[in-house]
Amino acid sequence: AIAKYLALEGAKVVILGRRVDAGNAIVEDIKAEGGEAIFLVTDVMKQEVLEQNLADIVATYGRVDSLLNAAGGNMPGATIAPTGTFFDLKPEEFQKVLDLNLTGTVIPSQVFLKQMVKQGEGNIVNFSSMAAFRPMTRVAGYAAAKAGISNFTAFLATEVAKKFGEKIRVNAIAPGFFLTEQNRSLLTNP
């Protein structure tokens, strides 16, 4: 919905994602409404893939105005079942949730921020969550990762303003809880 809104307001939107069919569907929806968009396959955990994405974007559009870091998710082993306890968390899945959400925000920020510094301007918007501030029970890994994103955003905003000026902004949004296929079971089975 955000990508479509931005495209309909005149932005040239690049959807970066792993799922080709889903990414192409968003692009086709945007184009059907008169917007401009392309899809590029990426992996937010692989710097070299993101660097190639950036090169392709700059070759196509000449610049990057904004980066919206929205990759993320949760895993069953990083949550606590209704009948479980903290001791049932699986450390390896907890780490995967931290990696995808937090490190999956840091790496794209590193890659795309370099281009914004060259341009002298740009915007980064990171997706945190209300779970960072009011953690729901059961989503320990996700809440910890999103709290990390909020803290990272505050750090990066200060770092960028001090070293590169105020024309590059870094902010976060913290959406509330939306029922999706990814979280339906968690939110509807208390």
Residue map of PLM features:
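Canonical Rossmann dinucleotide-binding motif of NAD(H)/NADP(H)-dependent dehydrogenases/reductases
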Residues: 1-14
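Conserved glycine-rich Rossmann-like NAD(P)H-binding loop of the short-chain dehydrogenase/reductase
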Residues: 11-25
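The beta1-alpha1 cofactor-binding region of Rossmann-like NAD(H)/NADP(H)-dependent oxidoreductases
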Residues: 20, 41-53, 91
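Substrate-binding pocket helix/loop in short-chain dehydrogenase/reductase
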Residues: 78-86, 90-95
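A glycine/serine/threonine-rich, flexible loop-to-helix segment
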Residues: 81-84, 163-167, 172, 177-190
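Active-site helix of classical SDR
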Residues: 109, 145
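Residue(s) in the substrate-gating loop at a strand-loop-helix junction
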Residues: 129
